[in-house]
């Protein structure tokens, strides 16, 4: 007994060891500033990332659509269920660190009557017991697996934040595209009305002998062209509304409008101060996800290395039983068994070593992907900064173009009315104005979308998350602090899941429902005599009185 206790104490001491590398955050050199950041801007980190960035546009309809999307979008709800799955995986991985216990009860009954050559008999052998098994975590295999599962959970949570950030950006992008199409529709209808007036006047001039039939046909061509543009815009607007409806988790329907596009564009993105690269990129969920995937892969190395060492399993059994033979009770009898088992890997054709190499290579891949995610983030921010700056310049140039084109139309109309030029010059100038106005509308949209992309690239607003769906009884888990390898401030489940008993039907209820009555294996089957059943009750009375 002393040797057994001493062995257990030694095993418990050894269980504090863990093979494999501990995670250390990689030191990655990054630029001190974003390319394209505003030189000399004030250090104000609250400009980005700490606010619900879509509210800077001050469009109540857009904000309402985003709120609905955060509640009903299916991609986001799927991501939330994956978090529940990852939480369960943490509980499963952690459970291997502790002993398992099982209870078993058996009551075999055997009865024979009406025998001619063999004597009649009636036997009942009730027995029950508990078995316990515990694989000691001497080398940290199960703790490494738990560490990896917790990192996977955090990566899943970061993936959900990525979905949130992408969803908000997509809703804003599609909404502003819809408002741009509305602006194009407004321009097209105004142009159609103008061309209708041109056509009517041209027909009147042709009837008066001032204009030619060619002038009429050219005016008709411009009129029908504008009408076709309107028909195509109707299609595009409805398709855009359908896309927004799906994003917010609804069936296709009309989308309410808020502020006009030209008023939206009056809201400019604030200057990006230099020196905020570390703070802002540390909040990008895709970078955090890549790091947690690196943490998980690193922990899997230790899990694989632990398989190279001996494993110790301590199992035991304790129980009691008895017998009732032809009405006579015997027992109860007790039983106890302890069985420590040591398993040492001997020959596996290099499988275990290859498993270590495989996980080491996966860790190297995860490190490269982490570095790549950081580099891509810098590229996206730089692209967004130049996009905001140049889209604004393009929009200003297009405004000047439209102003010049309107004046050109005024002058060409005066020249035509004065008989200096042909009607073709007026039509060409008016057509060029229509095209310039459509291009200006698109430049308004592109400038706003560049602002949206900038906020997305800087990870802005992702911390405003939608609530997880209410977990079921099997997945409602108590939180536990994350180990040192996980991100600070986040929690993962560490307790056992609650079991669900609702909906189960007892054997007696099932038999009553099915109307099957007693069977041959039951003590009540076959009309057993009172002596035997009385002995059974006496046996159980003696058993539970011990």
Mark where each language-model region is.
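C-terminal motif of bacterial Sec signal peptides marking the signal peptidase cleavage site
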Residues: 15-16
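Post-signal peptide N-terminal segment of mature Sec-exported envelope proteins
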Residues: 26-44
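Regulatory alphaC helix of protein kinase catalytic domains
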Residues: 38-68
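Small/polar (Gly/Ser/Thr/Ala-rich) solvent-exposed segments
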Residues: 77, 97-122, 133-162, 181-182, ...
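Amphipathic alpha-helical coiled-coil segments
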Residues: 78-93, 163, 167-190, 194-199, ...
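Hydrophobic, lipid-facing positions within transmembrane beta-strands of outer-membrane proteins
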Residues: 124-132, 174, 276, 336-342
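Short, solvent-exposed, mixed-charge loop/turn linkers that connect secondary-structure elements
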Residues: 190-193, 210-212, 231-281, 422, ...
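Acidic, low-complexity, intrinsically disordered peripheral segments
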Residues: 251-252, 266-268, 438-546
